[in-house]
């Protein structure tokens, strides 16, 4: 009950006539290998209104960051960051659409989520 987590695209490449595509099959397969279902999930795009809905808006790479700031117009509260900024090894997370490394991307996302959780615990948000 402490978290509301959503995923949103920074482009419309996977959204046609207002309807988002389902999760890309190789990504869905990687998630399934880890017991994670993405059934019913479809692409949605980040909106300016999302800024007020969320305490943190995390991107995967610097290209995401640039696009998030373009969509949001500003980040006066410092909510927009890269997921791996919270890790001991800050870096971009490679887009597996281009690399094919869905397993590597999954590992990087897990690393970032675990680091972000530790950050929240350290600042007493949990």
Where are the predicted features?
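A structural signal for well-ordered alpha-helical scaffolds and beta->alpha junctions
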Residues: 20-24, 61, 113
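Phosphate-binding/catalytic loops
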Residues: 56, 62-126
């Amino acid at each position: 009950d402490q978290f509301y987590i959503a995923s949103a695209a920074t482009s419309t490449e996977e959204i046609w006539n207002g309807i988002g595509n389902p999760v890309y099959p190789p990504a869905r397969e990687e998630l399934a290998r880890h017991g994670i279902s993405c059934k019913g999930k479809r692409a949605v795009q980040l909106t300016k209104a999302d800024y007020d809905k969320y305490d943190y808006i995390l991107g995967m790479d610097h290209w995401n960051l640039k696009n998030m700031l373009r969509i949001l117009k500003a980040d006066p509260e410092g909510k927009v960051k890269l997921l791996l900024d919270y890790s001991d090894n800050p870096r971009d997370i490679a887009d597996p659409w281009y690399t094919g490394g869905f397993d590597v991307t999954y590992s990087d996302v897990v690393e970032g989520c675990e680091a972000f959780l530790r950050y929240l615990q350290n600042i007493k948000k949990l």
